[in-house]
């Protein structure tokens, strides 16, 4: 059960990161470029 919860949490974080990157393609990691 815990593994399933972590998998869902990881997937949700990945989806949020992709959405954020889509909205701010050039400003995701400005200090690392």
Swiss-Prot record:
<keyword id="KW-0793">Thylakoid</keyword>
<keyword id="KW-0150">Chloroplast</keyword>
<keyword id="KW-0934">Plastid</keyword>
<dbReference type="GO" id="GO:0009534">
    <property type="term" value="C:chloroplast thylakoid"/>
</dbReference>
<protein>
    <recommendedName>
        <fullName>Unknown protein from spot 19 of 2D-PAGE of thylakoid</fullName>
    </recommendedName>
</protein>
């Amino acid at each position: 059960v815990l593994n399933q919860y972590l998998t869902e949490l990881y997937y949700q974080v990945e989806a949020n990161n992709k959405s954020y990157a889509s909205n701010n393609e050039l400003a995701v990691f400005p200090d690392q470029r």
